């Protein structure tokens, strides 16, 4: 009982105090003498809230740009001219981990690029919308779901005109994995897939569904970009099996506006850190 109390009460102290009718302690400094003391320490450096927000956005973009790493750029394929249209492949493109207020489509269009509208709508509102990564650990270990659940190539091919919409575009395969605080990844995929050949794989490598899509892209396009969206290091030993993947770029957790910086790296307006 004592052990349970020591474990459960501290993180829920405010709730326990409320139930017992206790008040949290505090310090009344209203009678403190302030003569000769500058009480306006920490003066705001902005005249308006809008100016503060603009500065926060600029800082977010700067930090994101400096954190993005260009891991591979064979033949100098990147940067791209802004008359390029990109096809963002995988459900992770529309559910980018750690990118919230500005999505990939908006960021790249704002940078002057074209974005494959048919493919974007397929993942965001069409027959590809119900796929995507599991949440990882639930409530710090109460349960876990590390399923990958990527939309299969067969579903993409069954959609009239979808694969044709990718012609004359540069495909960007978004490879995402859930990782971070409270999300210890599984040693294998045994409990997170029904596909036998994937059960012995790790979470940090592509599963059979992803590999089938990557093979299709490799066979049908001469320039493919691999975009990594993971806060954990991933296994990239397989990349050499797909010679059409000329560019690999790592852009984990971009924050609210960081995808704008990613688009500017694709255009050459910003430089990645590596």
Which stretches of residues belong to each language-model region?
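C-terminal non-catalytic regions of proteins with extracellular/luminal or membrane-system context
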Residues: 1-274
């Amino acid at each position: 009982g004592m052990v349970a109390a020591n474990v459960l009460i501290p993180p829920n102290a405010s709730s326990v105090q409320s139930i017992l009718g206790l008040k949290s302690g505090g310090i009344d400094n209203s009678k403190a003498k302030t003569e000769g003391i500058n009480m306006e320490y920490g003066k705001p450096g902005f005249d308006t809230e809008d100016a503060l927000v603009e500065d926060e956005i600029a800082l977010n973009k700067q930090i994101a740009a400096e954190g993005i790493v260009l891991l591979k750029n064979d033949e100098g394929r990147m940067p791209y001219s802004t008359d390029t249209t990109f096809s963002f492949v995988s459900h992770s493109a529309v559910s980018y981990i750690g990118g919230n207020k500005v999505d990939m489509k908006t960021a790249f269009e704002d940078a002057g690029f074209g974005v494959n509208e048919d493919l974007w709508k397929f993942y965001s509102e069409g027959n590809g919308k119900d796929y995507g990564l599991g949440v990882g650990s639930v409530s710090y270990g109460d349960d876990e779901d590390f399923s990958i659940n990527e939309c299969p190539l067969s579903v993409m091919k069954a959609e009239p005109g979808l694969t044709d919409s990718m012609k004359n575009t540069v495909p960007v395969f978004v490879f995402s994995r859930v990782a971070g605080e409270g999300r210890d990844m599984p040693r294998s995929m045994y409990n997170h897939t029904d596909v036998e050949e994937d059960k012995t794989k790790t979470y940090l490598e592509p599963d059979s569904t992803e590999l089938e899509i990557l093979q299709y892209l490799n066979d049908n396009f001469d320039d493919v970009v691999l975009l990594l969206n993971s806060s954990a290091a991933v296994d990239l030993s397989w990349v050499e099996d797909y010679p059409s993947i000329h560019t690999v770029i790592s852009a984990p957790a971009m924050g609210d506006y960081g995808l704008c910086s990613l688009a500017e790296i694709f255009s050459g307006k910003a430089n990645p850190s590596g």
